[in-house]
Amino acid sequence: MAANKERTFIMVKPDGVQRGLVGKIIERFEQKGFKLVALKFTWASKELLEKHYADLSARPFFPGLVNYMNSGPVVPMVWEGLNVVKTGRQMLGATNPADSLPGTIRGDFCIQVGRNIIHGSDAVESAEKEIALWFNEKELVTWTPAAKDWIYE
């Protein structure tokens, strides 16, 4: 996959949806120059969430995390672009909002780690796994934005 075709999985969590932050989050990724290739508005089942967070299943906070993520609708998305996984994580800010810098999504919009409004893949491999878990191949839209020549050399 070409470097500017890298994909990441980003999901607005229930608190981000309830607070009306979906548009602001999408706007930040669009303004950066990343391309949206998939988006859903859904209420995730506990089974799906348990698969998504399987690597955390032994942690004491796991049941609470699954319940929180199942407490309202979420907005899973797939974004594409050059170094989108790394840059996306930087845009999100630290997992704990108290450690997030102003200008990051978490630094600007949240206070506590238990309500940190957004998830982002931490590596290309986890992005591929998460994208396959939440979207089927037909839901990933291939298109060319008119602005691409103004973003990439």
From Swiss-Prot:
The entry's keywords: Acetylation, ATP-binding, Cytoplasm, Cytoskeleton, Kinase, Magnesium, Metal-binding, Microtubule, Nucleotide metabolism, Nucleotide-binding, Phosphoprotein, Transferase
List of residues that carry Phosphoserine: S126
EC assignment: 2.7.4.6
Membrane-crossing segments per the record: none
Active site: residue positions: H119
Entry's family note: Belongs to the NDK family.
Subcellular compartments: Cytoplasm; Cytoplasm, Cytoskeleton
SUPFAM superfamilies: Nucleoside diphosphate kinase, NDK
Protein name, per record: Nucleoside diphosphate kinase
Main location: cytoplasm
Pfam families from the UniProt entry: NDK
Reaction equations catalysed: a 2'-deoxyribonucleoside 5'-diphosphate + ATP = a 2'-deoxyribonucleoside 5'-triphosphate + ADP; a ribonucleoside 5'-diphosphate + ATP = a ribonucleoside 5'-triphosphate + ADP
